[in-house]
Amino acid sequence: MKIAQIAPLMESVPPRLYGGTERVVSYLTDELVHLGHDVTLFASGDSISSAKLVRCVPMALRLDANVSDPIPYYMLMLDRMRELADEFDILHFHIDQFHFPLFRLIAHRTLTTLHGRQDLHDLKALYVGFSDMPLVAISNAQRKPIANANFVGTVHHGIPVHLLKPTYNRGQYVAFLGRISPEKRPDRAIGSPGRSTFPSRSRPRSTKLMKPISAQRSRRF
């Protein structure tokens, strides 16, 4: 099967730094190649993949000091995708809903995995208007705010099983790794150790000014 994987342009695939979506796209793409599919990855030029790579921008937009607005680059990528669409059996999008208007006429050959939060009020109208676009959720909880959207399944995010091995020895602290934003609930990660015998440590990422998220000052960052 000829498959196009359309990745976000903000980070490379796989990401050099933070980039949960790009990391999942990398794992999925490489596994599809391993299974024998003919896969083409549309991503930033600094991406590394076993699939054929179409370099839509020279480098990850977040790391390009000359880029202030990513939207024009997504528009150019989607126009290129529109021209090449007939070459693929399936076009798998990982860029939210940017592509909906351009690819509606071939919706049956597209798949859109929603990697972010879907509980924003205005999204309901969008999914009603584009009810023919097939969607994949990354959890059943993600589907609840837009339960009537055109979901064809839930595929939980996963990683290759050999990457991490569990340890059953008692640790010394609870770690929070992730982006500091309301939907990630870092406040729960910081507050939970206070109800146990474990201290907490955080490795946050934030591109905006960080405001105090806890009255407790004993947390290590």
Where in the sequence are the language-model features?
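Catalytic cores of nucleotide-sugar-dependent glycosyltransferases that transfer UDP/GDP/TDP-activated
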Residues: 1-221
